[in-house]
From Swiss-Prot:
Localisation per UniProt entry: Mitochondrion inner membrane
One GO biological process term: ATP synthesis coupled electron transport
EC number: 7.1.1.2
Catalyzed reaction equations: a ubiquinone + NADH + 5 H(+)(in) = a ubiquinol + NAD(+) + 4 H(+)(out)
Organism of this sequence: Choloepus didactylus
Origin: domain of life: Eukaryota
Family in the record: Belongs to the complex I subunit 4L family.
Organism ancestry: Eukaryota, Metazoa, Chordata, Craniata, Vertebrata
Name this polypeptide is given: NADH-ubiquinone oxidoreductase chain 4L
């Protein structure tokens, strides 16, 4: 396995570990999710370039669209929670349940 793939998998693992460890604040969780999506995007792009299939080139674009939607929804939720409660703790999301 080339060192490029090892570095990308290490970045994915570190972002996943950060998501598991720093889940108390919403902003840090969103940053770790963006790191996960970026590592997946780079890995899927490299895989699409190495396989030389036309259909596999669509996957990174779809993944980037979902990452942009996730970032927009996450930031909207962060703004709403911080304006309502004044904090960005994830525990405040339990208060939003009906």
């Amino acid at each position: 396995m080339p060192s490029t793939y090892i570095n990308i998998l290490l970045a994915f693992t570190m972002a996943l570990l950060g998501l598991l460890l720093y889940r108390s604040h919403m902003m840090s969780s969103l940053l770790c999710l963006e790191g996960l999506m970026l590592a997946l995007f780079i890995l899927s792009t490299l895989m699409a370039l190495n396989t030389h299939h036309t259909l596999s080139a669509v996957l990174p674009i779809v993944l980037m669209v979902f990452a942009a939607c996730e970032a927009a929804l996450g930031l909207a939720l962060l703004v709403m929670v911080s304006n309502t409660y004044g904090l960005d703790y994830v525990q405040n999301l339990n208060l939003l349940q009906c």
